[in-house]
Design a protein with these regions (language model features):
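Sequence-specific dsDNA recognition surfaces
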Residues: 1-4, 18-49, 65, 181-194, ...
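Short, solvent-exposed linear patches
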Residues: 133-136, 326-327
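Short amphipathic coiled-coil heptad-repeat segments
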Residues: 143-146, 150-180, 344-362
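Short, surface-exposed secondary-structure boundary micro-motifs
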Residues: 56, 140-142, 146, 245, ...
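Non-catalytic DNA-recognition/assembly elements of restriction-modification systems
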Residues: 1, 123, 127-131, 168-191, ...
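Short, ligand-facing micro-motifs at secondary-structure edges
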Residues: 2, 20-32, 50-74, 88-93, ...
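A short glycine-rich beta-alpha junction/loop motif
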Residues: 72-77, 109-132, 262-268, 300-323
């Protein structure tokens, strides 16, 4: 269905490639919309239907219909496969194997953007057995997927709890006005790019990792480099700000406090050596949750958005006392450790599923 999306009408839902969750391959109901125009039954998703992305970077992404998802119409960039002679979940599970994604990588290669048409999808070899055996295997995998979905929900709820605690505590506590410049001495870093990374060498952080790898607090360094000449090293308690993005100004406000000394810092970022009058960990939480929109107003640019220290140094902040900052930081660090434990459990469950899929569908 090549229809535009409109506000959800309460009955008819519209599933597009972006509505299929990357992690769970389920329909995400965070932003429900309806298809605009005349609704055609041949685009209605039914039991035993699998939807497959046919073009773009998401080629190969799949979704298996669930009755609980309601009345769904699928968009034109999705292909529907109706599985009637085999267990749909058994077939769907094979679309999450390394074998499948290797096949997608080869089959989707185009001179332009990647894509796979319906005839090509039908050529992917599916392993089958008796319907009774397929149903048993599908039941096991379904239970594991449900557990993974529950684990994702636990992590999501813990993150929401953290945000709520930060915001509610901030609302209730007494605050004093300071400027960004009062927080400590700022510093710039050297040039360091992805090409400078190596398997071994000195621990380092490049600015892109502030978006993709690290959260509010950096306790373990993931990257290394052999480029050491003239580079700036971290001090424990430094607050690191990325200074450019192509997304939006709000997402640019994503600083991290580093709890490790002598780490090479490089790329499009700046830092602040936080004064002992402030808790660097609390400040990281504060900027990521409370002052994000406030500082985003100082960012400049359209295609590439920039933020420099000089843009924000005079910005006014309302902060709790150091005693309150220390108390709050301790609570939030403990909550982050709980999130980390749950994320490790999620990784174990995901690895278990991958192992089972590999053993069953080599």
């Amino acid at each position: 269905m090549n229809a535009a999306a409109k506000t959800y009408d309460g009955v008819n839902k519209y599933i597009r490639i972006t509505d299929i969750d990357e992690a769970t391959s389920t329909y995400t109901d965070k932003d429900i919309v309806s298809p605009d125009g005349v609704l055609k039954d041949n685009y209605l998703v039914n039991d035993c239907d699998i939807l497959l992305a046919r073009t773009g970077a998401s080629t190969g992404k799949s979704y298996l219909y669930k009755k609980s998802d309601g009345k769904l119409y699928y968009a034109g960039f999705l292909i529907r496969a109706n599985v009637t002679t085999h267990d749909p979940y058994f077939v769907f599970s094979q679309l999450h194997t390394h074998r499948y994604w290797r096949w997608v990588s080869i089959m989707s290669a185009r001179s332009g953007q990647p894509g796979i048409n319906s005839q090509e999808y039908s050529s992917f070899p599916i392993y089958t057995t008796s319907i009774k055996e397929e149903s048993k295997i599908a039941k096991l995998l379904s239970l594991l997927d449900d557990r993974i979905a529950t684990q994702n929900k636990i992590i999501e709820d813990l993150k929401k709890l953290k945000s709520a605690i930060i915001e509610e505590y901030y609302r209730q506590t007494e605050k004093n006005e300071v400027c960004v410049a009062d927080l400590g001495n700022h510093f710039n870093v050297g040039n360091l790019a992805k090409d400078d990374l190596s398997e071994t060498g000195k621990p380092c952080i490049i600015y892109g990792e502030l978006f993709t790898t690290y959260g509010e607090i950096i306790s373990q360094i993931e990257s290394h480099t052999n480029k050491t000449g003239g580079m700036i090293l971290s001090k424990k308690g430094d607050l690191l700000f990325p200074s450019s993005t192509t997304v939006d100004a709000v997402s640019l406000i994503a600083p991290s406090v580093i709890n490790v000394d002598n780490v090479i810092l490089g790329g499009d970022m700046f830092g602040i050596h936080i004064s002992h009058n402030y808790n660097a960990q609390y400040l990281s939480y504060y900027f990521n949750h409370i002052a994000k929109k406030q500082l985003a107003k100082f960012a400049k640019g359209s295609t590439i958005i920039h933020l420099h220290y000089t843009d924000i140094e005079k910005a006014k902040l309302l902060l709790p006392s150091l005693e309150e900052q220390n108390r709050m930081a301790k609570c939030l660090v403990a909550l982050d450790k709980k999130v980390s434990v749950e994320q490790n459990l999620l990784s174990s469950l995901t690895c278990q599923k991958s192992y089972l899929l590999q053993q069953m569908f080599i």
